[in-house]
């Protein structure tokens, strides 16, 4: 897949009809999901990933990336703990399932405490909600 850099939308974890419409309204064809709410406590299965991809395709959008898996998928790997080999195999399965489903990019963080940020969106100028740094 040889695609030029484009603007896409993301940073949501549920794929709703409203979000798919919003992506189109914003003039984008691409989107990513951040730690999507998919079933699985060790890995993501092909069928679930393919379902998300099919919804994107039906909306004439490209699901280009999933950013972050649950930390419990790879915390033992990050910390070098017993069970890391099993987690590594599940991560390999997740990546393969993503590829099979046609989702080309997996972004991840390498922080066992999760991503650091302010815990809740704050009310900003004009009533907008967003991250506030104090």
For each predicted feature, which ranges?
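N-terminal pre-domain/capping segments
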Residues: 1-134
């Amino acid at each position: 897949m040889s695609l030029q850099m484009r603007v896409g939308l993301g940073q949501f974890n549920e794929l709703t009809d409203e979000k798919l419409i919003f992506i189109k309204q914003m003039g984008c064809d691409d989107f990513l999901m951040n730690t999507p709410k998919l079933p699985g406590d060790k890995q993501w299965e092909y069928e679930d990933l393919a379902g998300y991809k099919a919804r994107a395709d039906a909306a004439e959008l490209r699901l280009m990336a999933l950013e972050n898996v649950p930390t419990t998928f790879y915390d033992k790997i990050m910390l070098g703990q017993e069970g890391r080999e099993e987690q590594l195999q599940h991560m390999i399965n997740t990546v393969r399932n993503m590829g099979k489903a046609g989702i080309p990019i997996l972004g991840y963080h390498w922080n066992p405490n999760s991503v650091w940020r302010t815990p809740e969106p704050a009310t900003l100028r004009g009533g907008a909600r967003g991250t506030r740094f104090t």
